[in-house]
Amino acid sequence: MYLSLLKSLNRLSPRAWDFVQLTRIDKPIGIYLLLWPTLWAVWIAGKGSPSLNTVFIFVAGVFLMRAAGCVINDFADRKVDGHVKRTEQRPLVSGKVSSREALVLFAVLVSLSFVLVLFTNSTTIWLSFGGLALAACYPFMKRYTYYPQVVLGAAFSWGMPMAFTAETGELPAAAWLLYIANLLWTVGYDTYYAMVDRDDDLKIGVKSTAVLFGDADRVIILSLQGLALGCLALAGSRFELGAFFYMGLLVAAACFAWEFWSTRLRERDACFKAFLHNHWAGLAIFLGIVADYALR
């Protein structure tokens, strides 16, 4: 229904559809991958009963900041996307949206996100500036380092410490275990994503962990996912989570094993499906957290 409504917008206003494509709200996978770990932190911080105010702020913030991240990413890549098969039709490349319009939209989305943060507390407000800096600089990292996925992981995980300070006013040390776990997981799944474009990236000189890891890519991804699960298990013990949480981790581990097997030939479609599949791992962990608190 969600996608049907968006597609009807294309028929009613092709111009509006250009901005839908720029923000990629028609492709919710990025929202899911940002939403689930944010909700892990929200639920754990709230001990299973987070305030509706916190839930609303962080869910809305995920939608807005993911859209903002897509806009600034396409702005940064506007001169190289035309050389990559997957991105050659993006609105900034085709000229359907101008660079100025993209920057204005980015500013609007970031401003709306900041308005949400103003309804939290001073610690969370200060932390939000770190998240903005990471989101803004990530798209440019692939020009200078083979580790842009690490910066993306840092950006995608920044909502987790913010969730703790917003909900409790404090930032326990164990919250950083969640942060590290999500950073490792993000590097893993975004390397699958980068493997889709690796041949094009090698031709145009774009850097990524997929390029850096080479033939060791899948083994390194699986290792990162294993380390992420280890950090989550340790965080679970610190936050006194129980059996349902660990069942969620087992489901996530099964997801990771399937991804490793399905990408054994490194076909583009298989790598992209493995990237998409990580949404289910994140959801499984979230449902494990919810069930663990609800069924005590």
UniProtKB/Swiss-Prot annotation:
Q: What class of enzyme is it?
A: transferase
Q: One GO molecular-function annotation for this sequence?
A: 4-hydroxybenzoate polyprenyltransferase activity
According to its UniProt record, which cofactors does this protein need? Mg(2+)
Q: Which InterPro entries match?
A: HB_polyprenyltransferase-like, Prenyltransferase, UbiA_prenyltransferase, UbiA_sf
Q: Name one Pfam family in it.
A: UbiA
**Which parts pass through the membrane?**
28-48, 52-72, 102-122, 123-140, 146-166, 169-189, 219-239, 241-261, 275-295
Has UniProt tagged this entry with the keyword Cell membrane? yes
The reaction(s) this protein catalyses = all-trans-octaprenyl diphosphate + 4-hydroxybenzoate = 4-hydroxy-3-(all-trans-octaprenyl)benzoate + diphosphate
Key words, A-Z? Cell inner membrane, Cell membrane, Magnesium, Membrane, Transferase, Transmembrane, Transmembrane helix, Ubiquinone biosynthesis
The family note in this entry says: Belongs to the UbiA prenyltransferase family.
Which NCBIfam families would you find in this protein's record?
ubiA_proteo (TIGR01474)
- This one is known as 4-hydroxybenzoate octaprenyltransferase
Could you tell me which species this protein originates from? Pseudomonas syringae pv. tomato (strain ATCC BAA-871 / DC3000)
Q: What is the lineage of its organism?
A: Bacteria, Pseudomonadati, Pseudomonadota, Gammaproteobacteria, Pseudomonadales
